[in-house]
Swiss-Prot record:
It comes from the Bacteria. This is Uncharacterized fimbrial chaperone YbgP. Residues 1-20 form the signal peptide. GO terms for molecular function: protein folding chaperone. It is found in: Periplasm. Could be required for the biogenesis of the putative YbgD fimbria. Its main location: periplasm. It comes from Escherichia coli (strain K12). GO terms for biological process: cell wall organization; chaperone-mediated protein folding; protein folding. InterPro entries: Ig-like_fold, PapD-like_sf, Periplasmic_pilus_chap, Pili_assmbl_chap_C_dom_sf, Pili_assmbl_chaperone_bac, Pili_assmbl_chaperone_C, Pili_assmbl_chaperone_CS, Pili_assmbl_chaperone_N. The gene is ybgP. One of its GO terms (cellular component) is outer membrane-bounded periplasmic space.
Length: 242
């Protein structure tokens, strides 16, 4: 069975791989600087077709580069329902990365389908789906204690329908939920990532209340909910698991 050479007719990039035949087993990667490499599992969920899986790393600007981290193997074949591994290996040049904060990369994987049957009389549009997940390089100096929730250090202030999110930590904080309650996000809200020691603004739309539910993503990609009370100085409090 042959595979398409070059770019397919249509390329779709998605963040979580939810519609892809070949999917990674996680939605984010934390690479601890003390480790030589980190691994993730990929799976071909197709019952009938083999796929090629093409993997590479991009920096924060979306530029493809293997100068700091490299994905191995860069390309591999997965038979139907087969699983395999991709190793992300650090290069010696990672010593040049900041030691006082995380650095953001992206792991990308593009599935390449087999070429269509040439004997078919029907026109076929093939779509190559590309998964893209965040990869956080965590310096050796940053060590979270068991159960530590650095996300609760997020500093929030409210002015009208605008929330200012200030991250005083050395970690990337991803705010994936903002709502009046736990039943749904505010209309128009989009996930916000706040880089270490930086500030980002987000809009609350037509909602002018002072109480919110705010959800952040932990190291394992799980959504953790907090309550946010902005009567005076905004205060974050973790929501206890039910």
């Amino acid at each position: 069975m042959t595979f398409i050479k070059g770019l397919p007719l249509m390329l779709l990039t998605i963040s979580l791989g939810c519609n892809a035949a070949v999917q990674p087993d996680r939605t984010r990667i934390v690479f601890n600087a003390n480790d030589k490499a980190t691994s993730l599992r990929i799976e071909n969920q197709s019952d009938k077709l083999p796929y090629l899986a093409y993997s590479w790393i991009e920096n924060e600007k979306g530029e493809k580069s293997d100068a700091l981290l490299v994905a191995l193997p860069p390309i591999q074949r997965l038979e139907p329902k087969a699983t395999s591994q991709v190793r992300v290996v650090k290069q010696a040049s990672t010593t040049q990365l900041p030691g006082d904060r995380e650095t953001l990369f992206f792991y990308n994987m593009r599935e390449i389908p087999p070429a269509p049957d040439k004997s078919s009389d029907h026109a076929i549009l093939q779509v190559a789906i590309q998964s893209r997940i965040k990869l956080f390089w965590r310096p050796a100096a940053l060590r979270k204690k068991a159960g530590e929730k650095v996300e609760l250090q997020l500093q929030v202030s409210q002015q009208g329908n605008q929330l200012t999110l200030k991250n005083p930590t050395a970690y990337y904080l991803t705010i994936a939920y903002l709502g009046r309650n736990e039943k749904g996000v505010l209309p128009g809200f989009k996930t916000v990532m706040v880089a270490p020691f930086s500030t980002v603004n987000t809009n609350t739309g037509s909602y002018s209340g002072s109480q919110f539910y705010l959800g952040y993503m932990d190291d394992y990609g799980a959504l953790r909910m907090t309550t946010l009370n902005c009567s005076g100085q905004c205060r974050l409090q973790a929501v206890e698991a039910k």
